[in-house]
C-alpha cells in the first residue's frame, strides 16, 4: 500500500486513505478491500482463494464469514499447526486445508488426527524436501505445495525457469510463487 507502519495501527476507515501498489511498486487507484468483498468477488468470478489464517487470528471467525458468504467451495484455508487444523476441521469439515507437512514427523502428526486426507493439501515448505516425502504424500492421495517465494523463485529465474518443471517432476503439484506467469509458461500451462 501507499501507507506506512503496521496495518494493525490503523482503523479500516484510516486505511481507506491508502491505495494499493502493483508488483512494480507503482500506486494504483485501488483501495484495500475487506475480506467479505474479496469473498464476493471470488464467488462471482469463480476464483479459488487460499486464505492465510495467521496464528493471532481466531480460525472460527474466518470460517464463520466463509460460511455466511457460502464460499466454502472457493476457499482453501492455510493452517499452521495441528491444533489450528483440527479446530478448523471441526468447524468446517468440508473445507480444503493447506496443512504444514514439511517432513515425515509433521505428516505423521496430521495422520494421527481425525481429519481425512481428502481435506488436506500438504504445504511442504519453502525448501525442497526429500523425494520420499512427496512419494508418501501422493500414496495417501494428498497433493503437495512448494513455496518457491523468494530464494527458489530467484534460482528458477537464473536457470531460465526450467526448475519449475524439475520441481513438478519431483512431485510438486502446486507451486506457490511470486512468478506465476513464468511458472505457468515453464510448466506449459495455457488458459
Predicted regions and their residues:
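Metal-dependent phosphodiesterase/phospholipase catalytic core, i.e.
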Residues: 1-105, 117-118, 124, 138-140, ...
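C-terminal active-site rim and adjoining tail of enzyme catalytic domains
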Residues: 25-29, 100-101, 108-191
Amino acid at each position: 500500500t501507499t501507507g506506512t507502519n503496521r496495518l494493525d495501527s490503523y482503523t479500516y476507515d484510516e486505511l481507506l486513505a491508502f491505495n494499493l501498489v502493483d508488483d512494480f511498486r507503482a500506486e494504483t487507484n485501488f483501495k484495500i478491500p475487506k475480506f467479505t468483498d474479496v469473498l464476493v468477488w471470488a464467488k462471482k468470478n469463480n476464483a479459488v482463494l487460499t486464505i492465510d489464517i495467521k496464528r493471532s487470528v481466531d480460525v472460527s471467525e474466518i470460517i464463520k464469514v466463509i460460511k455466511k458468504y457460502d464460499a466454502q467451495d472457493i476457499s482453501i484455508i492455510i493452517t499452521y499447526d495441528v491444533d489450528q487444523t483440527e479446530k478448523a476441521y471441526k468447524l468446517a469439515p468440508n473445507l480444503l486445508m493447506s496443512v504444514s507437512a514439511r517432513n515425515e514427523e509433521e505428516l505423521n502428526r496430521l495422520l494421527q488426527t481425525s481429519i481425512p486426507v481428502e481435506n488436506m493439501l500438504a504445504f511442504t515448505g519453502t525448501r525442497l524436501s526429500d523425494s520420499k516425502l512427496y512419494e508418501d504424500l501422493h500414496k495417501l492421495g494428498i497433493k503437495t505445495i512448494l513455496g518457491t517465494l523468494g530464494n527458489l523463485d530467484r534460482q528458477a529465474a537464473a536457470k531460465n525457469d526450467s526448475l519449475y518443471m524439475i520441481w513438478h517432476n519431483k512431485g510438486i503439484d502446486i507451486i506457490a510463487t511470486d512468478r506465476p506467469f513464468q511458472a505457468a509458461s515453464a510448466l506449459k500451462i495455457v488458459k
